[in-house]
Amino acid sequence: MKKSISVFGTILFLLLIVSTASARKFSIGAFAGLNLPLVQQDAKSGALFGAKGRIPLLPFLALEPNFVFAKYAGKDVGVREKTYPQEGGDITSFGADLLVGSMSGMSKVKFYGLTGINFNTYKRKGFSNETGLGWTLGTGFEFLPTEILGLEIRARYHAIKVGEGGKAYLEVSGGLNYYFGSE
């Protein structure tokens, strides 16, 4: 009996979330910006671009699967009074962010915080590829000049665990979101 009530409650909760989500506007978007290395001494800032979708779960909560490609510039490294050039690198990231804030409603400006988890591949010429799990934490806002188009600016701290160490970046980006569905 207890198990039946738990299963029924779980199904009811999932149906509530699905029905709430189906009554909201979904979006797809693209973005571009800068990656600023925070702890790496062998890399300079580079460009990033990506794509994402936004799935509203509740009026204040949304799930955002995303794909990000980033390229980093190399940096000259000095060893024993001699300078050696270092190649830049590429990071490919696939993950999902959870957005908390004003995700629905008639407001023309939406503010939100975000946190997420992602899987990353780091490639650098002359080195073996590294993969690792990462997490993000950030904030952003979106301006909606029309009902179907949103202009967005966000900043994310992106930390990646690689081997015994890690990498950390500040990602600053701007993008466009196209909305479909009903409010």
Indicate residue ranges for each PLM-predicted region:
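Cleavable N-terminal export/targeting peptides
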Residues: 1-25, 181-183
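Transmembrane beta-barrel outer-membrane domains
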Residues: 23, 40-46, 85-93, 128-134, ...
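Transmembrane beta-strand segments of Gram-negative outer membrane beta-barrel proteins
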Residues: 23-34, 111-113
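N-terminal targeting signals for Sec/Tat export/insertion, comprising classic cleavable signal peptides
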Residues: 32-60
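Short, solvent-exposed loop/turn segments at secondary-structure junctions
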Residues: 38, 121-124, 159-161
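Gram-negative (and chloroplast) outer-membrane scaffold detector with strong preference
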Residues: 54-127, 132, 143-149, 172-183
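Short glycine-rich, acidic/polar surface loops and turns
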Residues: 137-142
